[in-house]
Amino acid sequence: GINVLSDKPMAINSQSFKLLEECFAIAKQKNIMLYDIMTERNEITTMLQRELSTIPAVYGEQLKGSPEEPAIVKESVHHLFKLVDNKPLTRPVWYLDVNQQGEGIVDVTTHLVDLVQWEAFPDQIIDYKKDIELIDANRWTTSISPEEFKQVTGTDAYPDFLKKDVENDTLKVYCNGDIVYKIKGVTAKVSVIWNYTFPKGGGDTHFSVMKGSKADLVIRQGKEQNYQPELFVEAVKGVDLAAYEKDLTASMEKVSAEYPGVALNKVGDGVWQVEIPAKYRVGHEAHFGQVTEHFLDYLKEGKLPDWEVPNMLAKYYTTTSALDMAKAKK
């Protein structure tokens, strides 16, 4: 058998989820590893958000939330056409075929669902049969004109396999989706939106919040942050701010022992920005190398951490069941 380090998504619908379960069973039997590439766990703002959420003096207890007010939210906005190193990014034509790439609700959401699990339940096993409860799921299309199609793929005409998604010359791709669900009793929401492109000076955006009884840990990546993710600690109403600031400052000293240079900057009443030195912002491409290093360590040890396989299954169960739920809506 072959050890496999796979790009996400490993499953894009319920059928492939069943197949994935079989693959994990075979891997276990043959003592080989099957692992997906979760680059976003190596993004520094996410690592620090996770770290701070494990410190009761900073975070308090994880709130349970509700469908109207989820206690964990992760939303990202991506763009089909963009410049990478000042050159237009050309995407393969099949990238726009949901039967090959997967719909948005089962593609990039894989990362967001992974982070909900990894941050809120670190090193804990999640059993999808009893720990996951879907509440709501939606999917919708992004329209791409023939000119835009040519610009992003470099191809003149829609191939036959995309004709199913063309209406009046416009390609409609189901690349957007959101999922509201409960994981071990905590209500979470993930959402992925793909627009065609962004206005000049714009970029991909990300928003994430984890809500604790003492503070919200918020990642913002928007215009104000120059499209670079930044982490904020926002004390909840009713907290004694003077006492909280002492606790937060003391806790940050422990964090900066592990991440030298990371510091707090008070930006408002009960609001602090976590200052992150540039050396920690290694960029998306470097994360692939970091994931590979982890995988090679696991190969040396001869096993994945106990929680990884059940949690991969929980993750793909969540995304593929959400697709079924969203498709069932008319």
Q: Can you say where each PLM-predicted feature lies in the sequence?
A:
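Conserved structured core elements
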Residues: 14-18, 43, 110, 173, ...
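Glycine- and acidic
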Residues: 5-6, 36, 79, 95-102, ...
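Contiguous C-terminal substrate-recognition/catalytic subdomains in enzyme active sites
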Residues: 167-170, 224
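Beta-strand-loop-alpha-helix segment that lines the small-molecule cofactor/substrate pocket
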Residues: 1-41
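Predominantly a Rossmann-like dinucleotide-binding segment in NAD(P)-dependent oxidoreductases
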Residues: 29-36, 40-168, 295, 329
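Hydrophobic residues in alpha-helical segments
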Residues: 24-28, 53, 299-302
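C-terminal helical cap and adjacent loop that interface with cofactors, partners, or active-site loops
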Residues: 107, 112, 116-117, 124, ...
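Short secondary-structure boundary/capping segments
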Residues: 21, 50-57, 224-228
